């Protein structure tokens, strides 16, 4: 039987130390148990930690100091691209001189010479720029070259970054995109294939998706209220007709990046083959005339096929002397012709495949 005096007497020093020790152990076990359970419930926790580490590394690379970022801003910062690490310049883009000139005047100059235009609202850089046109014509290259030339921080935003299984998290991530861009300004938020993210809204849209789009557009509108804000949303698409009309209103500066014409194709070919082993008798104007309807990426792939023909010939050669020389012959006119024919057959086959899937009423 425990006497009442045992409860009323003061605890000895050893008993107090023992009690504190047990409480400490209990608290530590409880903390780590709860932490483990939270991590187990959220399977993306590990990815978030890795994204935070990557974001901190990128922030140091671009020289950003004393800027506090929230957890959501850290998730977006993982998609930052350092302009100094972009190995793309205007000299890497051929056949788009008019577009480049317009971009320099309307986007780059107001950012680089901000002090000249600070008293004019009309001459501020646009808050939205749309690059549209057929695939493979250099839209993404133009966006990167613009960011590098203007010295802007480049946020390569993937639509999947803004999706989260928890209700309300997508809106917080959308808000973090703009709050981060403002903290790092001048900055460009680039959305490739923007039509897949901000396409025409309909009543069949999921509630969470509709709310996230509305939040994104509302924050985008907020950029217009601060005329000194140097944040630009730049999008690229092959299907501008699928974009929501509210998005088109927010992107008043639009550039049509069309398939290259004859002189543009010749300039692109010169750029692609500039540092390659090409026979001096190759007539690039003739090649350009035979590649009507080819995009810039088509021309690059065609030149690669022509160069591979030379490599294949070297590999298949049975002459030991030729292997001893260890040289691959230059690309010749006939190699380019063969590559053109191969590319045309591939494009025709793809077109026929599309036609077979078209439903005829």
Swiss-Prot record:
EC number: 7.4.2.-
Sequence positions that bind ATP: 133-140
Catalyzed reactions: [protein]-with a C-terminal TM segment(out) + ATP + H2O = [protein]-with a C-terminal TM segment(in) + ADP + phosphate + H(+)
SMART domains: AAA
Annotated Gene Ontology cellular component terms: cytosol; glutamatergic synapse; membrane; mitochondrial outer membrane; mitochondrion; peroxisomal membrane; postsynaptic membrane
Compartments, record wording: Mitochondrion outer membrane; Peroxisome membrane; Postsynaptic cell membrane
Key word Ubl conjugation present: no
Predominant subcellular localization, coarse grouping: mitochondrion
Record has Phosphoprotein as a keyword: yes
Membrane topology: Single-pass membrane protein
Primary role: Outer mitochondrial translocase required to remove mislocalized tail-anchored transmembrane proteins on mitochondria. Specifically recognizes and binds tail-anchored transmembrane proteins: acts as a dislocase that mediates the ATP-dependent extraction of mistargeted tail-anchored transmembrane proteins from the mitochondrion outer membrane. Also plays a critical role in regulating the surface expression of AMPA receptors (AMPAR), thereby regulating synaptic plasticity and learning and memory.
Family statement drawn from the similarity comment of this UniProt entry: Belongs to the AAA ATPase family. MSP1 subfamily.
Protein name (record): Outer mitochondrial transmembrane helix translocase
Lineage of origin: Eukaryota, Metazoa, Chordata, Craniata, Vertebrata
